């Protein structure tokens, strides 16, 4: 059986390689937090492993001074 070879183009990560990931930049951080306040996985957010680690650290740093909530329990 011949499988058809489909060429596909890998989607680029939403953050460029030169963009800084900072805990003060809430507009960029909020893209990677779910509605419930959880950190999105790398598969969902399409970040590279290095960017995912940096984003996780930035989100956790933003939670400490209450810039970002730990949980969002708005029902």
Swiss-Prot record:
Listed transmembrane segments: none
Listed Gene3D superfamilies: Ribosomal protein S18
Primary location: plastid
GO cellular component, one term: mitochondrial small ribosomal subunit
Cell location: Plastid, Chloroplast
Compositionally biased spans, kind Basic residues: 1-12
Source organism, top-level taxon: Eukaryota
Annotated region described as Disordered, given as residue ranges: 1-21
Keywords noted in UniProt: Chloroplast, Plastid, Ribonucleoprotein, Ribosomal protein, RNA-binding, rRNA-binding
Keyword GTP-binding: no
GO BP term (any one): translation
Gene Ontology molecular function: small ribosomal subunit rRNA binding; structural constituent of ribosome
PANTHER family per record: 30S RIBOSOMAL PROTEIN S18, SMALL RIBOSOMAL SUBUNIT PROTEIN BS18M
Subunit and partners: Part of the 30S ribosomal subunit.
NCBIfam families the UniProt entry points to: S18
Family: Belongs to the bacterial ribosomal protein bS18 family.
Protein name (database record): Small ribosomal subunit protein bS18c
Gene behind the chain: rps18
């Amino acid at each position: 059986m011949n499988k058809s070879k489909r060429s596909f183009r890998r989607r680029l990560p939403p953050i460029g390689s030169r963009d800084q990931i900072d805990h003060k930049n809430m507009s960029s951080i909020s893209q990677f937090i779910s509605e419930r306040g959880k950190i999105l996985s790398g598969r969902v957010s399409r970040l590279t492993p290095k960017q995912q680690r940096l984003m996780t650290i930035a989100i956790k740093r933003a939670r400490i001074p209450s810039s970002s909530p730990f949980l969002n329990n708005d029902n």
